């Protein structure tokens, strides 16, 4: 399957299939220098393939730690200095091979190395079907997640579904949150279909027909970002579940998608309060439990600390916390939410998880 962005210019292909990695050579063969930036776990599981790609293209290979630990100023400085030491030219292409954090980090390296070199996304997780598309790159700050970054498009996204074969279930859960989010942004039929396809842990772990749902997720995101690349309007819809989710992720250091799923539940409660919707919160909580999302962390939540982190969310403005809420499934809108409402929603939320 192949998609393509539809900006006015500077578009890029998105290839989603088994053996998609076979297309990589055609994109990088003419560069003077190529650097593979590889997640350490991916390198461990796929070292023979990656060594072949490195040698075939006379490339450099840089192995980086897995996950968010890479997305710090100190690691960024260390890495970009090591790249500069290789005396690379602007005719360089960086290739991000890993999950969302690897793509975010490598994209930010590319955006800033020599004032900008090309890069290609090779996502290896379900989660990265979301982050690899759309051109957001960046690292974290002590003040919050993804607060240092840029909008910087890749030259291609090459999504080889073979990489999903080695994903542990906790990573499947993390990625599924973004797939489910895209269904919520579509319509009730999309939500019913995905819940029917993956009603429990066994079904989700099988990843049966995941290609279809990944394709639909990417398609949903593309339809939004071509209208609003720089997140001034409708692109904010893609942050469904992320205002509260990012705060939870940052404070408790849990996987991104686990936190986003928690944020989606919280969003439903806020919607019920201020939009007069009637979402069945128990249904969504039970669905998360049926998939075996680890929800024990919720018993450690404290409102004021999470509220402080929500205040630092980069989507906010002078009027305060902005959240993406669902007026109905498939009908997102951005609303300012005051502290009293957030606190009320938090009390309702935590009541559902009391021992």
Swiss-Prot record:
Its cofactor is Co(2+); Zn(2+); NAD(+). Zn(2+) binds at residues 178, 242, 256. CDD domains: DHQS. It catalyses: 7-phospho-2-dehydro-3-deoxy-D-arabino-heptonate = 3-dehydroquinate + phosphate. It is found in: Cytoplasm. GO terms for biological process: amino acid biosynthetic process; aromatic amino acid family biosynthetic process; chorismate biosynthetic process. Keywords: Amino-acid biosynthesis, Aromatic amino acid biosynthesis, Cobalt, Cytoplasm, Lyase, Metal-binding, NAD, Nucleotide-binding, Zinc. Its EC number is 4.2.3.4. It is an enzyme of class 4 (lyase). Binds 1 divalent metal cation per subunit. Can use either Co(2+) or Zn(2+). Gene3D superfamilies: 3.40.50.1970, Dehydroquinate synthase-like - alpha domain (1.20.1090.10). NAD(+) binds at residues 66-71, 100-104, 124-125, 136, 145, 163-166. Pathway: Metabolic intermediate biosynthesis; chorismate biosynthesis; chorismate from D-erythrose 4-phosphate and phosphoenolpyruvate: step 2/7. GO terms for molecular function: 3-dehydroquinate synthase activity; metal ion binding; nucleotide binding. HAMAP family: DHQ_synthase. Belongs to the sugar phosphate cyclases superfamily. Dehydroquinate synthase family. Catalyzes the conversion of 3-deoxy-D-arabino-heptulosonate 7-phosphate (DAHP) to dehydroquinate (DHQ). NCBIfam families: aroB. This is 3-dehydroquinate synthase. It comes from Staphylococcus saprophyticus subsp. saprophyticus (strain ATCC 15305 / DSM 20229 / NCIMB 8711 / NCTC 7292 / S-41).
């Amino acid at each position: 399957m192949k998609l393509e962005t539809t900006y006015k210019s500077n578009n890029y292909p998105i290839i989603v299939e088994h053996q998609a990695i076979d297309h990589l050579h055609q994109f990088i063969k003419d560069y003077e220098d190529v650097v593979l930036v590889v997640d350490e776990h991916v390198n461990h599981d796929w070292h023979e393939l990656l060594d072949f790609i490195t040698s075939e293209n006379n490339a450099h290979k840089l192995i980086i730690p897995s996950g968010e630990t890479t997305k710090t100023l100190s690691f960024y400085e260390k890495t970009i200095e090591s790249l500069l030491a290789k005396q690379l030219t602007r005719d360089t292409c960086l290739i991000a091979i890993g999950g969302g954090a690897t793509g975010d980090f490598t994209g930010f390296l590319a955006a800033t190395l020599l004032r900008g070199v090309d890069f290609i996304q090779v996502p290896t997780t379900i989660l990265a079907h979301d982050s690899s598309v759309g051109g957001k790159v960046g690292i974290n700050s002590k003040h919050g997640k993804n607060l240092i970054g840029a909008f910087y498009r890749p030259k291609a996204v090459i999504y080889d579904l073979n990489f999903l074969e080695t994903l542990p279930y906790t990573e499947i859960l993390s990625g599924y949150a973004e797939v489910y989010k895209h269904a919520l942004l579509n319509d009730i039929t999309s939500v019913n279909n995905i819940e029917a396809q993956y009603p429990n842990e066994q079904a989700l772990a099988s990843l049966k027909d995941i290609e279809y749902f990944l394709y639909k997720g990417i398609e949903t995101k593309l339809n939004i970002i071509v209208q609003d690349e720089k997140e001034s309007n409708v692109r904010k819809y893609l942050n469904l579940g992320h205002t509260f989710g990012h705060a939870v992720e940052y404070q408790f250091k849990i996987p991104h998608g686990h936190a986003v799923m928690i944020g989606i539940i919280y969003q439903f409660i806020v919607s019920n309060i201020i939009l007069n919707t009637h979402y069945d919160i128990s249904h969504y909580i039970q669905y998360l439990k049926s998939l075996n999302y680890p929800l024990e962390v919720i018993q450690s939540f404290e409102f004021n600390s999470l509220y402080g982190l929500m205040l630092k969310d980069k989507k906010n403005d002078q009027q305060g916390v902005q959240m993406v809420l669902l007026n109905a499934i498939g009908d997102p809108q951005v609303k300012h939410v005051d502290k009293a409402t957030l606190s009320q929603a938090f009390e309702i939320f935590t009541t559902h998880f009391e021992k």
